[in-house]
Amino acid sequence: MGYYSLTEVTAVQYAKEHGYFEKKANVVCHEIGDGNLNYVFKLDDGEKSIIIKQALPYAKVVGESWPLSIKRATIESKALQIFAKYVPEYVPVVYSHDEELAVTVIEDLSRLTITRKGLIDGEEYPLLSQHIGRFLANVLFYTSDFGLQSEEKRVLEGTFVNPDLCKITEDLVFTDPFGHYDTNDYEPELQLTIDELWSDKTLKLKVAQYKYKFLTRKEALIHGDLHTGSIFSSPSETKVIDPEFATYGPFGFDIGQFIANLLLNALSREEEQRGVLFFHIEKTWSYFVETFTKLWIGEGVEAYTKEKQWLPIILQNIFTDTVGFAGCELIRRTIGLAHVADLDEITNKETRIQAKKQALSLGKELIKYESKNADIQLFRTLFQQTVSGGIKA
């Protein structure tokens, strides 16, 4: 029959035909997706529920003028299965994948809340940083040359060649926000700040280097889009979802994106409410380092993991990349195609514009920052300097 787009009616038919519900079951189905690239259906018969996710052959945020390969659904399904191999507690269960229809049937996580929404609403997730730090350390270590035999890594790397979505990242994260491109989206009040940003040749040279790292450093399997909208949370659980951008890339990319989105939420808050975000930023890194170090010592398969001086160099390189990638994410989420609710839902216009100017300033400083001795406190320090007016866009 070939590919066709599901509806709420045909999603129920599909689920029944594949044995997820009895033929006579009264199944309620709603399209619940708020993303840019897929349909997401929740199906519930009162006793059990599932999620059906279908990749569209175009970007929903733009329309059919932006075609995309539906093979990304297979990449997403495979990525979730790889993640589950190492950290099953931090990802939803994948029940099945239909390559022809680009349909994946997965665990319903309705008991949890999208982390971005929860943070905007003031919810606290005390285990978020512990879980994400450990998730990142396990996935990045075990899919790298340090935790995987080189021939196995090369085979796995070939599985995650993801040209369409990598091109989106190349353009929307590293290129378009730093110049005159139609995809950019921002308030007129930001124009002077943006003009200064676009004329900063030192900044552009640094962004070019980070883009080149993304293009060429195939260090480990990365999620590729690890923002707080790609994570479900509760006070006791954390689940990472939506790895359709998964590919082999730099160790620091996912860490930087996650931290940047915590910083964006911090910018939307009053000063006295920001401490929990810096707690999560600092703990994410400390749990990552702790877990990665244990795996390096106990599970390392590459010969030079036995050299004690090698690990600190690797961790410092990861941190340096984390800082720069976080800066790129701050800027693209402020003036690029895909904004974040943390800033856009600030109701007072003057406050919203000020927060966005601060996001641009902080992003610029993170990208341009150079020090081989920096530690995780750098994010707090530069943030405080930015919001206090010590750093101007």
Swiss-Prot record:
GO terms for biological process: L-methionine salvage from methylthioadenosine. Coiled coil: none annotated. GO terms for molecular function: ATP binding; S-methyl-5-thioribose kinase activity. It catalyses: 5-(methylsulfanyl)-D-ribose + ATP = 5-(methylsulfanyl)-alpha-D-ribose 1-phosphate + ADP + H(+). ATP binds at residues 38, 53, 107-109, 242-244. Keywords: Amino-acid biosynthesis, ATP-binding, Kinase, Methionine biosynthesis, Nucleotide-binding, Transferase. Pathway: Amino-acid biosynthesis; L-methionine biosynthesis via salvage pathway; S-methyl-5-thio-alpha-D-ribose 1-phosphate from S-methyl-5'-thioadenosine (hydrolase route): step 2/2. Its EC number is 2.7.1.100. The keyword Cytoplasm does not apply. Substrate binds at residues 225, 332. Gene3D superfamilies: 3.90.1200.10, Phosphorylase Kinase, domain 1. NCBIfam families: MTRK. Homodimer. Catalyzes the phosphorylation of methylthioribose into methylthioribose-1-phosphate. Belongs to the methylthioribose kinase family. This is Methylthioribose kinase.
